[in-house]
Amino acid sequence: MKRSRIIGISIIALIMGILLIVANLYINYNLRKYSVYYAHNIVHKEGTHPELAMALENMDAIYKPNKKNIRYRDDGGFIIYNTFSNNEQVIISCYPRAKELRYIYHDFTKKSYHFNEAFRLEYGYDSSTGLDEIDAKTVDQKALYKDIYNNFGFLVEANVNRKPLINMQKEFNKKYYK
C-alpha cells in the first residue's frame, strides 16, 4: 500500500513538473512569436519604434515573408539585406546576444545609423568621409524612419495583425517595458 502510494504521488509530481515546463516554454514562445503585435499595442514615446525593434530582435520566431531581393541571415545576429536592381543594398541588423542591444541600419550612401532598444536613433557614422560620427540631432529622423520602413516595414506589416490565441500583453509589458 505504501509503495503504490509513493509511486502514485511521484507520477503526479512528475506530470505536474512536465506541465509547468511546457507552460513556461509556451509563454516564452508566445511572447517572441507575437512580439510585434504586443509592441504595437503598448503606449510608447513619440520617436520610438518598438514594433520594428521586436521584429528584428525576434526574427527567428516571427513570420518572415518571402520577398524578391530580400535575404535573411541569422548566424549570431539577425541581418536583413534588401538588394535593389542596380546592386545597391540597404542592410538592417540586430545583435540580441550583445550586452547592449543595438540595431544598425546601413544605407547605400555609406552611412550607418545606430539605434537603442526602443529603436530611437542615438548616433551614426559616415564611412564615405572616413567614419566621421554623425550627430543624431542633425539627421532628418522622419525621413530616416520613412526610408527604413520603406525598405523593411514589410516585417512589421506581416506580423502586426497576427493575433495570438492566448493574449499575453501583460506578460509582454512586464518583460520588455518595466
Question: What is each model feature region?
Answer:
Residues M1-N24:
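N-terminal Sec-pathway targeting helices
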Residues S10-I12, E46-T48, R162:
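Generic detector of bulky aromatic hydrophobic side chains
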Residues L19-R102:
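N-terminal export/targeting and maturation segments
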Residues K67-K178:
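Extracytoplasmic electrostatic interaction patches
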